[in-house]
Amino acid sequence: IERMDVPREYAIQATIFSEAPGGCSTGTSAAVTVALIGALDRLTPGRLSPHEVAYTAHAVEVEMLEQQSGIQDQLCSAYGGINFIEMFEYPYASVSQLHVPNSIWWELERRLALIYLGKSHVSSQVHEKVIAELEDEGPETPRLEALRGTAEASRDAVYAGDFTALGQTMVENTEAQGRLHPDLISEDARQVIEIARSYGALGWKVNGAGGEGGSLTLLCPAQSYVKRQMLQAIEDESSLFQNIPI
């Protein structure tokens, strides 16, 4: 409200709800901030573009709350859908929306699963660890190049509707995260990955900054009954593990 400079004559009551637990590594804080800024923008003279909404939300987290934050969560929330984001100079980025046939949309919805590991985390702490580890290597370090490559490969796989390639890219991304810092792949995440692997999952990705708690995204096998068995096995493994509907 302070950032948007809402006229003082307005009394504001905001109600916030999300299916995703807080600290779930799914960009919930960015999504909430984007939604509030979009709503408050209706009360102010200007009309912000999606890009402007995203950068205002980013400023709230970085400048006002003094948190470490990328810009991708805010951009995804502001634009919606599937996006390919190129960050050419932090925090500046361009957004290309991926338009795919309904058949690919529906298959993604059917195959993807979100597993909450039962503990929230503060991603800023993990960001600080990674920054400290990499600051002497520079932006062109091979460890970062590996992550950049998976973004392009996953974009191409989605366009092609190639779920095997998409799953492999998710696995490569997770392995590249682990090479950035060992703390990014927790023991709980490794447990879930092993169960998913045993059921023939095509891919798995530690979400967000990784570390303790948070969540994983799984790309499930084609057979729905195998997906159900896999999710049940994951939830049976620990009372902390929870399948979040998406």
Please report, for each region that a protein language model flagged, where it lies by residue.
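Anion-binding (especially nucleotide phosphate/pyrophosphate-binding) glycine-rich loop
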Residues: 1-56, 189, 196-198
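C-terminal nucleotide
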Residues: 1-6, 43, 55-68, 74-205, ...
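Short, solvent-exposed beta-strand edge segments and adjacent coil->beta transition regions
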Residues: 11, 21, 110-112, 213-215
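FAD-binding core of FAD-dependent oxidoreductases
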Residues: 19-35, 68-83, 205, 209-213
